[in-house]
């Protein structure tokens, strides 16, 4: 016989399959020894041991005194009024139980390594009814402690269990469906550091403590099929406070509470679970309902689950939980030192009808996070009590400002019927956040961002949204004031993105119109909303298939840091604007219109800053009755145009003097242009700028103001730099160099006037000022620099050097058949200008000259007709 099978040195009740009974009474078992069960080994039958003593029995492996064990049968043993002293074994110093054991009114002293080892599948009834009984039983049992009745804390023992039953050993407690009730007298369990505890199939109620109303865990705790309800903590962890490792599975947390509602400096919470700094939390298949009682928005509380340590939550259900920062879950990595962050992972879970001011579903404050395959439905963030409604954000998820460098992913999730002031479903203030494969439907915000609101006064969140669907969110799907990426590659993508987003739309790739979508975008992407589009340096190409943008009346649009190319339309090849449009750091090149506005046609308000217009064109070259043009910009009758710091180059391609075209910028409405650069633009009436107040009714005129700008090497028959036709104008601090008005093609050279500026006949009563400007090396037939045919024109503090005219007025020609110009010149210089007549000036009308210097003009300075 091998020693491994040596059992029961005193008594063995072996396996036979018979239904037997046995009684051991008034007996003493001392100094017995075996490999298994030092004194008694019971493998079958209903056996009663009563009024017996077991002293100094031992087993090498298990059951120093008694083993209740069988590989075949299911023995049931009851031990009554017996004593176990100084028995020993590796497992179960006194008793090892594998099946059914009841112990009544018995005492255990000095047994080792433990008193009772109860196997996981076994049932052990120790008659536990009070917290004292429970504490004693935990002291006795190793393995699994089973409960066979409900347990309640009594008033008499409350003082001893303020911190709960202490568990400082590895143990599994099987509640067998019973309830442990602390009666609001104290905590239920405190689990020590370094110990592994499992609690299963039990209900814990009415626990109350400063932290962790039901459980305070410093060890490694697993809760399986446990219900925790109506527990409360003064500050943190209404049901559970975790400072160790906590695993929760298939459990319920209901109506747990936080007593103190916080202050300006302290935020309490975690009514279900508070996972502390070093805590690690895992939750699966569990329900969290109605946690935080009687919440008011003035209460400074965080979510049903609050976590500073790492947390993983899966396949769980959160309903009707409340808190100021996170009704269901709050994660607070911002409390960690330096750049450290914690991680929250949530998957396969449902958040429904939770409430809170910020993130009624999930509140993220300085944490990396992943939310996948979740449902957020009917969560709400609304102000009441002493909280104004203006601050209620993100009914489903809030990612708030903390200054931490965090990342977040939201994927495969549904957001429906959520409601807040800002960000009906999601509000994002920081981090690099990716949202993909998700549905946003019927979410609403009272102010902005029906589905998503992206904004911060402190940080610069970057948000990417891909492969997601937005349906019936109000007032719009997305409001963005920071950086948003939507994976836009086609015009259809761009139109959809604009329809989704309010605030700022960010482009993260080049965009091109495809042949398949061209028929739908002949007039371009329609913008009928206020929006900012940040191109991030990317290019939008219409591929000569249609216009790029059409902007509706009454809407304010900003386009920045983008390139628009190959747009084509009847008017406004790249942009047709009826609204209020700002172009900043935008390049428009190789766009074309059939008639007006090769790049932009403006019928609203247009502001252009630090932008480039290059090689834009007009396809039709006009007729005797129609003058087309504005290859860069055509500013229509009611248009208001402001341009600053921008370059206009090479607009109008392959110009011929027979082409009836007006300048790169053509304006009928008012226009202000400053600090800009015009080079190598061409047109018949105004190569660079044409202003046409003559087209306005009656005596009305428009106004052109040009300052601090350079006009170089522009070409045209009349006013290669600026052509003025019935407009008030001011030109100040500008440079006009090497502009030419010369005839070619079928145009005779006799009519080529004013290479820099032409003020032509219209019979309008106009006024013009030219001041502080330089005119050098300009050349024309008449008026090498300026030709003036009408208006009250004042020229002051300007220089005219090396300008020339083939016929007359090397610098200025004042001459007309129909008009009556009145010109005054003061404080100016005319040097080295030349013409056949009037090397500097020819005057046929009314000229006044004061304090002006003439040097080396040929053949003379002024030729004045009588």
Model-assigned labels for residue ranges:
Residues 145-170, 178-180, 184, 505-530, ...:
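N-terminal extracellular ligand-recognition/capping segment immediately after the signal peptide
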Residues 1-3, 10-26, 33, 41-51, ...:
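Surface-exposed loop/turn motifs in large extracellular/passenger domains
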Residues 43, 187, 261, 300, ...:
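Arginine-selective low-complexity/disordered segments
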Residues 127-144, 486-507:
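N-terminal capping/linker segments that flank leucine-rich repeat
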Residues 8-10, 37-39, 63-67, 92-94, ...:
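Structural detector of coil-to-beta-strand junctions
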Residues 1-6, 31-34, 56-58, 62, ...:
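Surface-exposed loop/turn segments connecting beta-strands in extracellular beta-rich domains
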Residues 35, 90, 99, 114-117, ...:
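Intrinsically disordered, low-complexity repeat/linker tracts enriched for polar/charged residues
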């Amino acid at each position: 016989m091998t020693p491994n099978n040596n059992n029961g040195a005193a008594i063995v009740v072996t396996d036979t399959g018979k239904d037997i009974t046995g009684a051991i009474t008034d007996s003493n078992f001392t100094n017995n020894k075996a490999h298994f069960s030092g004194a008694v080994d019971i493998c079958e039958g209903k056996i009663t041991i009563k009024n017996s003593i077991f002293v100094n029995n031992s087993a090498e492996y298990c059951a120093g005194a008694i083993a209740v064990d069988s590989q075949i049968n299911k023995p049931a043993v009851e031990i009554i009024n017996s004593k176990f002293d100084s028995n020993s074994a590796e497992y179960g110093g006194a008793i090892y139980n594998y099946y059914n054991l009841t112990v009544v009114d018995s005492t255990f002293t000095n047994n080792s390594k433990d008193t009772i080892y109860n196997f996981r599948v076994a049932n052990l009834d120790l008659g536990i009814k009070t917290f004292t009984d429970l504490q004693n039983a935990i002291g006795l049992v190793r393995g699994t402690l089973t409960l066979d009745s409900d347990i309640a804390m009594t008033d008499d023992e409350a003082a001893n269990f303020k911190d709960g039953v202490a568990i400082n050993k590895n143990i599994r407690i099987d509640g067998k469906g019973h309830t442990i009730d602390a009666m609001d007298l104290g905590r239920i369990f405190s689990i020590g550091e370094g110990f592994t505890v499992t609690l299963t199939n039990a209900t814990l109620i009415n626990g109350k403590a400063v932290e962790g109303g039901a459980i305070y865990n410093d060890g490694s705790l697993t809760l399986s099929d446990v219900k925790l309800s109506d527990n409360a903590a003064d500050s943190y962890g209404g049901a559970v406070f975790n400072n160790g490792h906590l695993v929760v599975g298939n459990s319920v947390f209901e109506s747990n509470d936080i007593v103190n509602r916080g202050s300006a400096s302290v935020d309490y919470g975690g009514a279900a679970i508070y996972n502390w700094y070093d805590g690690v939390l895992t939750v699966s298949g569990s329900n969290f309902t109605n946690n935080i009682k009687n919440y008011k928005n003035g209460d400074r509380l965080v979510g049903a689950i609050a976590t500073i340590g790492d947390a993983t939550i899966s396949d769980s259900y959160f309903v009707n939980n409340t808190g100021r920062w996170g009704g269901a879950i709050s994660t607070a990595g911002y409390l960690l030192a330096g750049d450290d962050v914690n991680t929250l992972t949530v998957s396969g879970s449902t958040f429904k009808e939770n409430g809170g001011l910020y993130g009624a579903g999930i509140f993220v404050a300085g944490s990396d996070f992943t939310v996948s395959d979740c449902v957020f439905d009917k969560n709400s963030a609304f102000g009441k009590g002493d909280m104004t409604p203006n601050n209620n954000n993100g009914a489903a998820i809030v990612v708030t400002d903390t200054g931490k460098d965090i990342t977040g992913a939201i994927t495969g999730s549904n957001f429906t019927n959520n409601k807040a002031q800002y960000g009906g479903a999601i509000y994002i203030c920081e981090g690099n956040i990716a949202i993909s494969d998700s549905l946003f439907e019927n979410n609403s915000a009272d102010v902005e961002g029906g589905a998503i609101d992206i904004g911060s006064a402190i940080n610069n969140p970057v948000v990417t949204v891909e492969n997601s669907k937005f349906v019936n969110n109000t007032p719009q799907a997305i409001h963005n004031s920071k950086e948003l990426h939507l994976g836009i590659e086609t015009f259809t993508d761009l139109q959809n993105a604009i329809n989704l987003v309010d605030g700022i739309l960010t482009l993260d790739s080049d965009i091109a119109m495809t042949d398949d979508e061209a028929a739908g975008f002949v007039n371009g992407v329609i913008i009928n909303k206020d929006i900012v589009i940040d191109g991030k340096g990317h290019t939008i190409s219409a591929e000569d298939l249609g216009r790029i943008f059409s902007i509706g009346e009454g809407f304010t649009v900003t386009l920045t840091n983008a390139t628009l190319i190959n747009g084509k339309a009847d008017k406004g090849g790249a942009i047709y604007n009826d609204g209020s449009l700002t172009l900043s750091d935008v390049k428009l090149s190789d766009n074309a219109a059939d008639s007006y506005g090769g790049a932009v046609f403006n019928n609203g308000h247009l502001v252009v800053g630090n932008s480039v217009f290059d090689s834009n064109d007009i396809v039709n070259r006009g007729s005797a009755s129609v003058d087309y043009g504005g290859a860069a910009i055509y500013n229509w009758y009611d248009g208001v145009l402001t341009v600053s710091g921008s370059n206009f180059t090479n607009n109008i391609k392959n110009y011929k003097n027979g082409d009836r075209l007006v300048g790169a910028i053509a304006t009928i409405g008012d226009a202000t242009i400053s600090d800009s650069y015009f080079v190598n633009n061409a047109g018949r009436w105004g190569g660079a700028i044409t202003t046409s107040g003559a087209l306005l009714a009656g005596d009305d005129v428009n106004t052109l103001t040009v300052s601090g700008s350079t006009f170089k090497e522009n070409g045209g028959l009349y006013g290669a730099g600026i052509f003025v036709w019935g407009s008030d104008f001011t030109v100040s601090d500008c440079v006009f160099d090497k502009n030419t008005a010369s005839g070619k093609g079928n145009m005779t050279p006799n009519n080529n006037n004013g290479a820099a500026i032409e003020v032509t006949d219209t019979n309008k009563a106009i006024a013009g000022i030219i001041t502080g400007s330089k005119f050098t090396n300009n050349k024309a037939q008449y008026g090498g620099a300026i030709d003036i045919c009408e208006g009250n024109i004042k020229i002051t503090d300007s220089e005219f050097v090396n300008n020339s005219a083939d016929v007359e007025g090397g610098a200025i020609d004042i001459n007309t058949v129909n008009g009556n110009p009145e010109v005054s010149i003061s404080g100016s210089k005319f040097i080295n200008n030349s013409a056949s007549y009037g090397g500097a000036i020819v005057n046929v009308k009314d000229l006044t000259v004061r304090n002006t210097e003439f040097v080396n003009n040929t053949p003379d300075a002024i030729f004045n007709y009588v």
